[in-house]
Each structure stands twice: as structure tokens, then as C-alpha cells.
Amino acid sequence: MADDKILARIAALLRQAEGTDNTHEAEAFMAAAQRLATATSIDLAVARVHSASRTAAQAPTQRTITIGEPGSRGLRTYVQLFAGIAAANDVRCDVASNSTFVYAYGFPEDIDASHALYASLVVQMVRSCDAYLATGAHRPTPTITARLNFQLAFGARVGHRLAQAREEAKQEATTDRRTAPGTALALRNKEVELRDHYRRSSEARGTWQAARASSGYSSAARRAGDRAGRQARLGASPELPKSRNRLSR
């Protein structure tokens, strides 16, 4: 992120969220982390509008985010989690055909924030899923089916929560009559610049979907994953562009 101190503050909020057993406190810390990321992104967007010159660090970029090793099971659920977080932070994604990595397109500060949130939430997702499976409540559904359904529901709920926090931060930034017009213009310019960058840079073909019919369905695991997502210590788009290239084995 352009300001390492801001990224450190976001990381501190995430650590506080992970360290409390109080669900309401955890939600407050996670939402605060997302609002801080959004507010910082807005401030930088406004600053770019008024900057006479631009550096590479102030322009949209592309970054590769590693999700997992080829052949690993459940990678789609990890991709969905990252995609939901990315969408809440104005980052667009192309997904490798084997779901082992994601190309993230966005401004550096937004990709940094997305990665920090993902690093915290993916641990929580796996931990809460393991705890659910350990109870045996998913039986007779196969464990892998239950895990996939749990984690898909977790990612979808978290993405929704982060999107809400983002909208709250944007509304707060655009309510001041003195600064609202300039802020709205900066956000619109940012949206257009990111869209143009994505169109120039992306080589995606086809679409990517998190869920597959062959994976099976478990309503109980979905409900459990949704509950865990609601309680996660702080999406997703159902379809994302699929990258043409696969990660080399």
C-alpha cells in the first residue's frame, strides 16, 4: 500500500479480530479494517485527481496471487473467498483454469488491502470448517462435499459483509457537501481507469464458476458455512473471467 502505516493499522485490526472470542467485537474489528481500507483508497483516488504527475505506484497494476498447489482439492472455495474480498476493494480478478492462482487487477493499495484481508480470513475459514466437520454434524454427507459447501457459503457471506462495510465507508465519504462532488468525481475516474486497465491487460477467455454440479450439495453444510461467515472476524461474483494460461507444474 502507498502508506505502509495504513497497512500496518489494517493488519493490527485483523489481529484484534482474530484474538477475541466475542463475536460482536470480532465483527466490529473486521468491519473497521474494511472501512479503513476503503477510506484510504478514496483519499488516494482524490489525491490522484489533483496530482500534476503520476508515478508507477499511483497507476493500476496487475499482480499474481497464489492460491494453492495444482491438484489440491477445494481451491475454488479459496478463489471465491479472495474474489469476494477483491470485489469489495475495487480489484478485478482473472482465475487460472485450475484455480491455483489469480491475476488481480487494481491500484496497489487496493490489492494490498485485499491480500491482507484474505490472509486473515482464509485461516478463519479453514479453522471454522475443521471445527464443524469434527462435530460429525455433516454426516452422512461425504466430508469433501461438506467442506466444499461450507467454505463456499463462508466466502459468499464474508464477501457480502465486506461489500456492506465498503458501501458504508463510501457513503460517509460522500455526505460532506463541501467535498462530495470532488470525491464522487475521483471515484468515477478511478472506476474508468481500472476498467480501461483491465481491458488492456486481461487475456481472459471464458468464465470461471466457484461451484460445480459434480461437487454435490449439502444444505446443512451451507447453513453452517453461512453462520461461520457471519461470525468471521473480519462473493462474490458468481462468475469471473478465466485465465487462458495454467500454472506450470
Say what each PLM segment does.
Residues 1-62:
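Long alpha-helical, hydrophobic tracts
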Residues 3-4, 42-249:
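Extended, helix-rich structural scaffolds rather than catalytic motifs
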